[in-house]
Amino acid sequence: QSELGLIESINTVKQIDSVNIFLGAAAIPGEEFVLTELGPEYVMVDEYSSSNGGIRISRFDYLRQDDAKNFILSKSNYMQAFGISAKTNLDLSSMKSPYYEVVIRVNASDESPLYFSVSCGENCQGTLALPLSPSNAWQTISIPVRCLEREGLDKSQINIRSLFLSQGSVNFDLHSIIIKEENESFSDISC
């Protein structure tokens, strides 16, 4: 019976239907970081300002029960970013058609693009511009992993699980990032 239990647990591990990346904060084992022209810095507190002052982060209540974070990126000559990495790679190859579900709100922007990227190492990433609503309302954006794969991502060895990048001035709120199994052929991003 112990062998049967082991086989069942192995099969369960292979049948991933969702992966939490960010729910008001990075989901374990993820680590939050920012990237400026000075390099990466890990974010260990709820109220944070990057060493160059170009990125500010604060935490707030989303719909009274969940947490969310506010990000203010200042205009820069360099790409600035907020991301979530992990020491262990994430393998999505057991998922048939995974997609990222991002719940986000843009509060203010100079209309520069806000990019979403996922990385699997040096010269191995997929990056797309997010289709953001200027209405200052919460929106749920679906990003198929297949679109990121077409841009160069290898979904079997993800190490930077999500990255938001911009050179522009943008103030946005982030509630959640969840990788789900696509059950319909919908998406907010065509690839």
List the model feature ranges, each with a label:
Residues 55-84:
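Short carbohydrate-recognition loop motifs
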Residues 75-151, 168-173, 178:
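Extracellular ligand-binding interfaces
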Residues 10, 19, 38, 143, ...:
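Extracellular beta-strand elements of beta-rich domains used
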Residues 3-64, 183-191:
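Extracellular carbohydrate-recognition regions
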Residues 2, 160-165:
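Short, aromatic- and glycine-rich surface loops/edge beta-strands on solvent-exposed regions
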Residues 55, 66, 95-99, 158:
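Short, surface-exposed loop/turn motifs at beta-strand boundaries within globular domains
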Residues 24, 34-35, 39, 44, ...:
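Extracellular glycan-associated modules
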Residues 150-160:
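Noncatalytic modules at the cell exterior or secretory-pathway interfaces
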